[in-house]
Structure formats: structure tokens, C-alpha cells
């Protein structure tokens, strides 16, 4: 079953730990199945696993396994799909536990690797000659924001993820030389959790709602991300706080409840729900911390003086107890707690945790007032020798409050530019302006929009009835305006404009936001929320700098951006990949980023890039810190936002230690990348990279868009139709009802190729591009050695090549009814895969894929051993379905294989 392109050293310590964990969890799964289902079904699982272990499953040659699967009843197929999917999930847990152990051991050993924590990055910069003043200036501008999105690549239910988390926790308790009774107790607990997992549905019977997505994400935020942020600010406050303000350094963002692009279920109500739910999480934490401080600071004025400001604050408390009349810190904290309760009542409709009931005090009008009260306590302690009485807890609370406010995560709004155009067209018509907006050319549109921003007169009338789409847009924007009034300006992140291509695309939402008071028109327009264009296609990425220049040349852009102007721009990895292939997409994003940074710098404006990455290589996936360090020099500037979506949220942030490691590593990478000098690039290097990107673009387009048979090939050889029916997200899979590749969303596009094990978006076009561009291996080696971007591109492509299995993919090709075209197209794909693999190894000088990354190679091999049999089972079931079997149980079995393969591969979208 081993991929012949991979080489695994089974004697490595990590490899031994992975195998030991996998064997234990596999044995416990069989034990649970035997206990719950009986010997006969357990024997069926054992028989299937034995057949899989003895055959060349990875190359599609598995007659014993195929024969076994062909004889299965539909009920047995459902059962085996569950068993293999569960085995795959447990194997991942075993690998993750071994990986955390490896990370812990590596952290304990001094080394010469790049800084992986912010504190180490600061030390490295100080060692390189940076002064405290220079570091303070850097920190003042830093803004690192991972943004959680609900893109549908997480197939598992929250209940299943919670079960896996508990299994992982129990596995982490296992150590060498445990007392036998404790070892037995842990094993029994593991058995119980695995048995419960077996009886838990892997995926949802009904399509998930936006409300579910908000709740699921907040579960991870509450249990791991927020505690990790608190820990980090606790460390940073004590060790690097002297270098400047920390609060802007790390924040969280979200699209949950605010991303309307192609999503009919997102509206003003989901926006309100998201912010209210987020608020409850952070206010409860604030309240808990204030209660702890109240318990500790029973400090009497009989023994220490306090500041007049603290006495004034304490005098406002409504505590009638005579026993605390000489304890002003407690009285002040009592007041703060009551005001937090009042805030919670106002924003969420319920008091905070630990509150005894409804309070009558005034709520804080904004988070700054909460921070100000806490600062009074800090100041009094410092001035009277009591700073060490509460350690770093109070300062950490202040820093977290500055970063999270009353909203926890800033919520972005996103909508498609086409919707803005249609909405404005109706508003202009209903207002009787005589403007037929949709008929105007670009120059005329900009003129009309700029004129609308030059005065305060609205287009909207409360006495006019608008169409459904326009009414929904206005209601959502009104909800956003109310949110700013309730939570403060920090509650909204950016207004993202999908399909941005022109200056008018940036101006349109400003005119719409003006209707609800989030933009003020006049000679010097102002805005409470900033607009951010999303450049998604190769052409739009190339044209992005020109759009930015046109925007910044408008006088109104300067007043809208404010006194410290920073323009945010989002770069789309997913649609640009679907548009032009892996190499052209990555090159387009990188060159676009550099050109945007140059343009912003030339115009005297800061730039914040927002990277719309997914989990898979084809959608910009890979370790976030490495991705930051691979960004072109001069494009990070201390500021970055990156999407964290689907299955990657649980993988990167599923437990507190992992969340902390990834967030700390991301912050460190941003700091180091920001201080990297811009190199003088050899024109020959740039020319070679440009030629490769263009030629790979042409090769990719020749297959995907120019071959008339390719569209049918895609729909017939991948389980795209079955994926559309799987309830893994609230968003529709396609923007329209058509089967065109152009209309399909990037996520199901990538997801489908992953299921059939092509991984095509992560590598196709590279080899043919090299050939078309006439580049030699020596030239490519020179590129990789002198160009971090190209080295990163190759590294990620090598992972996609290792994950792809052409033997299994060939079996999916056999599903196509058009045999001649299917075999012709697949021959092209297979040749490209073989050539890309050969080039990747030749450039690096490797003997096998990933042999320079043994942990990653083992991870891929482990996933393959678990997932390959599921592919064979899926193939059997798809054959039955497409032969006309419409049994509902068969559909369930297919969807179980889809869920199992996705969960096993872990970066499918």
C-alpha cells in the first residue's frame, strides 16, 4: 500500500511513536466494534483491512479488496465506510499526539532554526542591532489577524470533533513507565471514548446552518484560541511589553455571519447573532478575571495608601457591606463587574457568568472605558508599591481587552461586486435621479459615485418599497451600522468586495454604506468601515495595482482612510488557481502583492494584505508561518490578515497548546518578514519566473478551459455531484445552476480532485510550463536557491504530488461513460504528473518525494494507508449509483466515504 514515490524511515523516534499510537487506537476500535456490533461485523472489518494491507491498493491494483467490496450489501458498505473513516480519524489523532510530543522535545533543545516564538524573534532582532525604540515603533504598527471562515471543507460534526479532542487528551496522558493501574484506567477511558465515537454520526444528516457554523467556531475559540491568546499576552506583557503597545499585535477576525457572497442564508440577523454570541464569550471571560482579582485584592487602606482616582472609582460602587468600606480595590472591581454585567445585558440579553442577577448600573459605553477603569487600579498599585500583588493577570486583562473589546473577533462583511451594481441601479432608479447605472461605462459610473459621496443627501427613502435583493442588502448594512453603535468601531473588520476589478467596485459599497450612516458624504468624506477589494482572477491580480493607484489619486480616499492611512487589499488564492493553475496563481499573487506594496509606498499609504488561503496546496495552503516568510520582501510591513477555514481551524487551533504554537509562530514570522530587506532581483530570475508562470497558465488553460471534453470529464470522474449533496457547509457549491467550471466555487473544485486523489490544482501546469518556457533543471535550481517564493512553491507542490495517487485516479477515470476522451485527457494528466515529479526531485536532488521532510512524508503515507481502501469502496459504490441504483442507503454510504476520505486527508479544501 505504500506510495512508491515516498521513502519512510520506520526506525525514527517519531515514526515509532506514530506506529505505537496507531496500533493502540486501531486495536481499541476493533474492540469497540466487537463489543457494540458483534464478532461477525468485527471480522468483516478485519478481513477488509487484511486485504488492503496485502495488495497494491495505492496503484489501484487490489483484486481481493475489490472482490470483497463488490459482494457487499448496501448495509455492509455503510458499516465498512464508517469503520474505515473511524480508523482514518484515529490514525490522525495518533499522529498529532506524536507530533506534539516531537514539538515539545524540539522546544526543549536549543537550536539554530529560525525564531518560532515572538519572544525569540525579538531577541534575534535585538541581537542584530535593533534598539528598543525601533522595536517599539515596529510593535506600534503590527497587526496580525487570523480570520476564521466557514468555507465547507470541514466534514466532521462538532460532536465528532469534541470526541476526537478527548481521545487526543487521553493519549497525551500516556507516558512510559506509568503505574499499571493508571495505564489500565487510561486505556478503559480511551475505549469508552472510541465506542462513543463509533455511535456518533460522522457528518450531519441535514445541511448545516449559519447559526451552527457560528456555534461550532466559537466552541474552538472558547476552549483553545482565546486561552492561547490570553497565555500569549501574559507572556508578551512581561517579556516584551516594554517595547511598545501590544494590543494591535494579535487579534482574531471572522467571516461567520457576515460573508454574504453567494450565500442566501447570511443577512442582518446572522450578523447580529454572530456578534452577540462572540460578545458573550469574551464578556464571560472578563467577568471571571474580575472576580478573581476581587478575591485577591482584599487590600485595606488601613495598611496601604491608594490613589485619589481609585477612591473616586470605588465611591461609585453599590456595595452595601460595611466589611468592605476600607477595601477600595474590591469596591472598584465590584463596580467594574456590575458594569460588565450591564454591558452583557445590553448586548446579549443576559448577565455575565457569575452574576447574581440584573444590575442597575450604567453599562460601559465602549471598551475603552472598561480599560480606563482597569488602568486606574494598575496605576494605584504601581504608585503605592503593590504592582506585584496580582502578578501579570491585571495587565494581561488590559491587553486582551484592548485586542478583543466587547466583540472578541472583528467581523468582516463580504459581498459580490455584481450585487452592489444591481442594488445601486435600483436605488438610482427609485430615487428618480434618471441614472441607469447598469448601462453606464466605467468612467461614467465613477463620476456618478464620486458625486454621491460629495454630499450627505441619501438615495434611500423610508417610503419606497424595494426589491428583495436590495431590501436584504440595506437591512444587512443597517445591522452593521447598529453593531458599530453597540460594540464600537472595532467590531467590524473590513468590507470585502468579491470580484473586484475596477475603481467603481471600490466606490459602490461606500455609496451603499452612506445610506445607513457608516459613511459620511461631503467635501471630505469619512467612513466607519474601510472597503477592501478582493482580486481573485489572474487578470484582476495583474490589474490590482492600477485600481489601487486610481483609488489613492482620489482626494476622498485620503479622508476615508484617515490620519494614519492604511489600505487593505485581499488576494484570492482559490479562484486565481481555478482560473490559471497553481504556478500562475501563486506567481500572480506574489507579483501582485509586490506591485501593490510599491504603489502604496509611492502614494504614501500603508498596505495591509489579506491572504485568502485554504487548506489545500491548490488554494494556497501550507504552514501559515512559512507562508508569511515566503511573501515578497516589503509586502508584510508588520500587518497581515489570513483566512483560516474549514478543516484547518480544528487542525491548527483544536487544542490550546497547538493554537498557542501556531499563533505565536505566525506573530514571529510577521515580525521577521517585516524586517527583511528588499533584495535586488536579477532580471534573468524575474524573466524566468514570468516565463514559467505564463507558460504554465497556457498549459493549464489548454486542458481545463480549451478542451471541449474536459467539463464532462470532471463531472464524471470525480464525485462532485455527491459532494454537492453532502451537508458539509451552509453555502451552495456553485454560484449558478450551470455545470461550467467558471461558475463552480473553488472549494468544491479542489475538494473533488482531492477525493479522486488527483490533487490536480496543486501541481498541474508546472511541468508543461517548464517545457514551454524552455527552462533547464539548472536554471530551476538557481531559481529555487535564490528565490524564497519559488522554493516555497516547489515545497508545497511536492506535497501535492506526494498526496496524489495516479493509480487510484485511474480507477475514477474508468467511471466516465466517454471512454475515449476520458483516457485521452487522463493520459495528458498522468504525463504531467510524472514530469512534475521528476522535475521536483531533480531540482532538489532528492531520491523520493518528501525524503527531506521525513515527518511530512510519514504523515502522507499514514493518511494514504487509511484512505486508500475508502477510495476503493467509494469507487464500488459510485459504480452502483451511476448504474441506476437510487437506494437511499447507497447514497448514505457514498457520503460516508466522502466524509472519511476528506477527514483522512485533512487538507482537502
From Swiss-Prot:
Active site (record annotation): 151, 578
Record's GO cellular component terms: cytosol
Gene3D superfamilies: Phosphoenolpyruvate/pyruvate domain (1.20.1440.90)
Entry keyword annotation includes Magnesium: yes
Record flagged with keyword Lyase: yes
Keywords: Carbon dioxide fixation, Lyase, Magnesium
Classification via InterPro entries: PEP_COase (IPR021135), PEP_COase_bac/pln-type (IPR022805), PEP_COase_Lys_AS (IPR018129), PEPCASE_His_AS (IPR033129), Pyrv/PenolPyrv_kinase-like_dom (IPR015813)
Cofactor list: Mg(2+)
GO biological process: carbon fixation; oxaloacetate metabolic process; tricarboxylic acid cycle
Reactions catalysed, as given in the entry: oxaloacetate + phosphate = phosphoenolpyruvate + hydrogencarbonate
GO MF terms, alphabetically ordered: magnesium ion binding; phosphoenolpyruvate carboxylase activity
PROSITE patterns on file: PEPCASE_1, PEPCASE_2
Enzyme Commission number(s): 4.1.1.31
Role according to the record: Forms oxaloacetate, a four-carbon dicarboxylic acid source for the tricarboxylic acid cycle.
Protein family according to the UniProt entry: Belongs to the PEPCase type 1 family.
HAMAP family documented for this protein: PEPcase_type1 (MF_00595)
NCBIfam families: PRK00009.1 (NF000584)
Listed name of the protein: Phosphoenolpyruvate carboxylase
Organism (species): Caulobacter vibrioides (strain ATCC 19089 / CIP 103742 / CB 15)
Taxon lineage: Bacteria, Pseudomonadati, Pseudomonadota, Alphaproteobacteria, Caulobacterales
Amino acid at each position: 500500500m505504500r506510495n512508491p514515490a515516498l521513502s519512510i524511515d520506520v526506525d525514527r523516534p517519531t515514526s515509532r511513536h506514530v506506529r505505537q499510537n496507531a496500533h493502540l487506537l486501531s486495536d481499541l476500535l476493533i474492540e469497540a466494534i466487537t463489543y457494540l456490533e458483534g464478532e461477525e461485523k468485527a471480522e468483516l472489518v478485519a478481513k477488509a483491512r487484511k486485504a488492503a494491507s496485502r495488495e497494491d491498493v495505492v496503484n489501484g491494483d487490489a483484486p481481493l479488496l475489490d472482490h470483497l467490496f463488490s459482494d457487499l450489501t448496501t448495509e455492509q458498505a455503510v458499516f465498512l465506510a464508517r469503520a474505515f473513516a473511524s480508523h482514518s480519524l484515529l490514525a490522525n489523532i495518533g499522529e498529532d499526539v506524536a507530533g506534539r510530543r516531537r514539538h515539545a522535545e524540539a522546544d526543549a533543545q536549543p537550536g539554530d532554526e529560525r525564531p518560532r516564538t515572538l519572544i525569540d524573534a525579538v531577541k534575534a532582532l535585538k541581537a542584530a542591532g535593533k534598539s528598543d525604540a525601533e522595536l517599539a515603533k515596529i510593535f506600534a504598527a503590527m497587526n496580525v489577524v487570523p480570520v476564521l471562515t466557514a468555507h465547507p471543507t470541514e466534514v466532521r460534526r462538532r460532536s465528532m470533533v469534541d470526541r476526537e479532542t478527548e481521545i487526543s487528551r487521553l493519549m497525551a496522558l500516556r507516558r512510559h513507565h506509568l503505574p499499571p493501574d493508571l495505564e489500565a484506567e487510561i486505556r478503559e477511558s480511551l475505549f469508552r471514548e472510541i465506542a462513543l465515537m463509533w455511535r456518533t454520526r460522522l457528518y450531519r444528516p441535514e445541511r448545516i446552518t449559519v447559526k451552527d457554523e457560528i456555534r461550532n467556531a466559537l466552541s474552538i475559540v472558547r476552549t483553545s484560541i482565546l486561552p492561547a491568546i490570553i497565555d500569549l499576552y501574559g507572556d508578551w506583557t512581561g517579556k516584551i511589553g516594554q517595547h511598545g503597545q501590544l494590543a494591535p499585535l494579535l487579534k482574531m477576525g471572522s467571516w461567520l455571519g457576515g460573508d454574504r457572497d453567494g450565500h442566501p442564508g447570511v443577512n442582518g440577523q446572522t450578523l447580529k447573532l454572530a456578534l452577540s454570541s462572540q460578545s458573550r464569550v469574551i464578556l464571560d471571560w472578563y467577568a471571571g478575571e474580575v472576580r478573581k482579582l476581587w478575591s485577591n485584592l482584599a487590600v485595606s487602606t488601613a495598611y496601604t495608601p491608594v490613589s485619589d482616582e481609585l477612591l473616586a472609582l470605588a465611591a461609585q460602587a453599590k456595595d452595601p457591606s460595611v466589611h468592605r468600606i476600607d477595601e477600595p480595590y474590591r469596591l472598584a472591581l465590584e463596580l467594574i463587574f456590575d458594569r460588565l454585567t450591564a454591558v452583557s445585558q445590553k448586548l446579549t440579553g443576559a448577565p455575565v457568568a457569575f452574576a447574581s442577577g440584573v444590575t442597575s448600573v450604567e453599562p460601559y459605553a465602549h471598551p475603552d472605558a472598561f480599560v480606563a477603569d482597569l488602568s486606574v487600579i494598575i496605576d494605584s498599585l504601581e504608585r503605592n508599591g503593590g504592582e506585584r500583588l496580582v502578578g501579570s493577570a491585571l495587565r494581561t486583562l488590559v491587553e486582551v481587552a484592548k485586542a478583543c473589546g466587547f466583540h472578541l473577533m472583528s467581523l468582516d462583511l463580504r459581498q459580490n461586486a455584481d450585487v452592489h451594481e444591481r442594488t445601486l441601479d435600483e436605488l438610482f432608479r427609485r430615487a428618480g435621479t434618471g441614472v441607469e447605472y447598469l448601462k453606464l461605462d466605467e468612467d461614467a459610473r465613477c463620476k456618478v459615485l464620486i458625486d454621491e459621496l460629495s454630499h450627505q443627501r441619501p438615495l434611500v427613502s423610508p417610503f419606497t418599497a424595494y426589491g428583495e435583493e436590495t431590501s436584504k442588502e440595506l437591512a444587512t448594512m443597517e445591522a452593521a451600522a447598529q453593531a458599530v453603535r453597540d460594540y464600537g468601531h472595532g467590531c467590524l473588520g473590513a468590507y470585502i468586495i468579491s470580484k473586484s476589478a475596477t475603481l467603481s467596485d471600490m466606490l459602490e459599497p461606500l455609496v451603499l454604506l452612506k445610506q445607513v450612516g457608516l459613511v459620511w458624504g461631503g467635501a471630505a468624506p469619512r467612513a466607519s468601515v474601510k472597503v477592501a477589494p478582493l482580486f481573485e482572477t489572474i487578470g484582476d491580480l495583474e490589474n490590482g495595482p492600477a485600481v489601487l493607484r486610481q483609488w489613492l489619486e482620489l482626494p476622498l480616499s485620503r479622508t476615508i482612510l484617515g490620519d494614519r492611512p492604511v489600505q487593505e487589499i485581499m488576494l484570492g488564492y482559490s479562484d486565481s488557481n481555478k482560473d490559471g493553475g497553481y504556478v500562475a496563481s501563486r506567481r500572480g499573487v506574489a507579483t501582485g502583492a509586490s506591485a501593490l506594496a510599491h504603489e502604496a509606498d509611492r502614494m504614501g499609504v500603508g498596505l495591509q494584505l489579506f491572504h485568502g488561503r485554504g487548506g489545500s496546496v491548490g488554494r494556497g495552503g501550507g504552514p501559515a508561518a512559512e507562508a508569511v516568510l515566503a511573501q515578497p520582501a516589503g509586502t508584510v510591513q508588520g500587518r497581515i490578515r489570513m483566512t483560516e477555514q474549514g478543516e484547518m481551524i480544528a487542525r491548527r487551533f483544536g487544542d490550546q497548546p497547538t493554537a498557542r504554537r501556531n499563533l505565536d509562530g505566525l506573530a514571529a514570522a510577521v515580525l521577521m518578514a517585516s524586517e527583511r530587506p528588499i533584495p535586488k532581483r536579477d532580471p534573468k530570475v524575474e524573466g524566468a519566473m514570468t516565463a514559467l508562470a505564463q507558460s504554465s497558465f497556457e498549459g493549464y488553460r489548454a486542458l481545463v478551459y480549451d478542451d471541449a471534453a474536459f467539463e464532462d470529464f470532471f463531472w464524471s470522474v470525480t464525485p462532485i455531484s455527491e459532494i454537492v449533496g453532502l451537508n458539509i457547509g451552509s453555502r451552495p457549491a456553485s454560484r449558478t445552476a450551470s455545470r461550467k467550471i467558471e461558475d463552480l466555487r473553488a472549494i468544491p473544485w479542489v475538494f473533488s480532485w482531492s477525493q479522486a486523489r488527483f490533487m490536480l490544482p496543486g501541481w498541474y501546469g508546472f511541468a508543461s510550463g517548464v517545457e514551454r518556457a524552455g527552462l533547464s533543471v539548472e536554471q530551476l535550481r538557481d531559481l529555487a536557491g535564490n528565490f524564497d517564493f519559488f522554493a516555497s512553491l516547489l515545497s508545497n507542490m511536492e506535497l501535492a504530488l506526494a498526496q496524489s495517487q495516479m493509480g487510484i485516479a485511474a480507477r475514477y477515470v474508468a467511471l466516465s461513460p466517454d471512454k475515449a476522451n476520458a483516457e485521452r485527457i487522463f493520459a495528458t494528466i498522468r504525463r504531467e504528473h510524472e514530469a512534475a515529479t521528476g522535475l521536483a526531485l531533480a531540482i532538489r536532488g532528492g531520491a523520493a518525494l518528501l525524503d527531506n521532510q521525513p515527518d511530512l512524508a510519514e504523515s502522507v503515507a499514514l493518511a494514504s494507508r487509511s484512505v486508500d481502501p475508502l477510495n476503493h469502496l467509494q469507487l464500488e459504490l459510485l459504480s452502483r449509483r451511476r448504474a441506476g441504483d437510487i437506494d437511499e442507503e447507497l447514497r448514505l454510504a457514498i457520503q460516508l466515504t466522502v466524509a472519511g476520505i476528506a477527514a483522512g486527508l485533512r487538507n482537502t479544501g
